[in-house]
């Protein structure tokens, strides 16, 4: 059996969820969209179900997967619905739904539903992706109430630059939100992972922890609360070949690495088809047999090479951690010029094994 595996620590997941609650004193929707950022949405939701206030997913397909697994907690559709015909399913399965565009509001007004809906009305406060314009927000709120199709409305927005701790844009977005919602007596939701960790002055009734649930920091710099996160995923494999090379020999496709000295090279059963970033350069950290070393050469589809010169005890079968508790996913992502969100979501072929259930 190929040794590439992703170990999912569900106790760490619970710790990170509790941290979001502790830091905010708010109710928290655990964001499990995109298969829980590659960690397995159903497993993660089941692990959190007894304590989570609810879950958030991107679309109805992801929500129905949770319902089919027996998850009865509230589930919010972050992108809302894509066509009016979905409203019947939303009502049938008791899902919560974001409304971010006036066409969705009109669809609710015009479409019969079996029971009133819980709507999260999203305002565009400056990200300019989706959301009702601030000048239209009060009217949209009143139209939802007047439709007779809605039992509850939560007011929400999304931050564009909360991961930049010195960015004035976040405070500006809060100011836009507060001005536009003035006089509306409804619960609010503003804080995503970086806002939960790094913006304690922002208050909201609901928070939406995403990347922090999985133990990865959303920041490019060290941050005290992010340091309390516990990595949930350990991507691991084993050495499948070892060879000794003299100085001046190439390693891998394109000969992008030339051994500067006699070099002991280990080949790991892990590649970009598994989701490991192909763009990770020589020098990206790896742990072999408990010792930190580095990637060398270009990542292949199914294999990559590591420098074992300073790990003489490593041999065929030695364990390898690509990221996890000893090598942070954020460090690998930074080396590869990307973000931990992406490298987690890219894992498609690697089996997931859970601990801490």
From Swiss-Prot:
Assigned GO CC terms? cytosol
Listed GO biological process terms? D-alanine biosynthetic process
Keyword set, alphabetical order:
Isomerase, Pyridoxal phosphate
Q: Where is the active site?
A: 33, 253
Instruction: Identify the gene encoding this protein.
Output: alr
Check the record and name the Gene3D superfamilies matching this protein: Alanine racemase, Lyase, Ornithine Decarboxylase, Chain A, domain 1
Report the cofactors: pyridoxal 5'-phosphate
* Record flagged with keyword Isomerase: yes
HAMAP family tied to this protein = Ala_racemase
Q: Which residues bind substrate?
A: 129, 301
Family recorded in the similarity comment: Belongs to the alanine racemase family.
N6-(pyridoxal phosphate)lysine modifications at: 33
Its recorded name reads: Alanine racemase
Described function: Catalyzes the interconversion of L-alanine and D-alanine. May also act on other amino acids.
Among Pfam families, the record links this protein to: Ala_racemase_C, Ala_racemase_N
Enzyme Commission number: 5.1.1.1
Kindly tell me the pathway this chain contributes to. Answer: Amino-acid biosynthesis; D-alanine biosynthesis; D-alanine from L-alanine: step 1/1
């Amino acid at each position: 059996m190929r040794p590439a595996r992703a170990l999912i620590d569900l106790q760490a997941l619970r710790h990170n969820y509790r941290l979001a609650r502790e830091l905010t004193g708010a109710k928290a929707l655990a964001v499990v969209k995109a298969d829980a950022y590659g960690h397995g949405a159903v497993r993660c939701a089941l692990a959190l179900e007894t304590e989570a206030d609810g879950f958030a997913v991107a679309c109805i397909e992801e929500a129905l997967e949770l319902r089919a697994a027996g998850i009865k907690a509230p589930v919010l559709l972050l992108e809302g619905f894509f066509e009016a015909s979905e409203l019947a399913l939303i009502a049938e399965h008791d899902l919560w739904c974001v409304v971010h565009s006036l066409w969705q509001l009109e669809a609710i007004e015009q479409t019969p539903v079996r029971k009133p809906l819980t709507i999260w009305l999203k305002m565009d406060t400056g990200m300019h992706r989706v959301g009702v314009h601030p000048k239209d927000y009060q009217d949209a709120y009143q139209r939802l109430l007047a439709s007779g199709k809605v039992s509850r409305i939560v007011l929400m927005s999304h931050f564009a630059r909360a991961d930049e701790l010195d960015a004035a844009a976040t405070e500006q977005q809060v100011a836009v939100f507060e001005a536009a919602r003035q006089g509306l007596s409804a619960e609010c939701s503003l804080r995503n992972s970086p806002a939960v960790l790094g913006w304690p002055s922002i208050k909201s009734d609901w928070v939406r922890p995403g990347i922090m649930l999985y133990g990865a920091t959303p920041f490019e710099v060290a941050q005290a609360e992010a340091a309390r996160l516990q990595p949930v995923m350990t991507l691991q494999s084993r050495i499948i070949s070892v060879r000794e090379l003299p100085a001046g020999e190439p390693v891998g496709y394109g000969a992008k690495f030339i051994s500067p000295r006699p070099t002991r090279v280990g080949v790991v059963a892990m590649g970009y088809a598994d989701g490991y970033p192909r763009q990770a350069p020589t020098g990206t950290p790896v742990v072999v047999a408990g010792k930190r070393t580095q990637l060398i050469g270009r990542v292949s589809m199914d294999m990559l090479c590591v420098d074992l010169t300073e790990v003489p005890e490593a041999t065929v079968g030695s364990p390898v951690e690509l990221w996890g508790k000893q090598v942070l996913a954020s460090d690998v992502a930074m080396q590869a010029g990307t973000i931990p969100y992406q490298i987690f979501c890219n894992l498609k072929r690697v089996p997931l094994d859970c601990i801490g259930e």
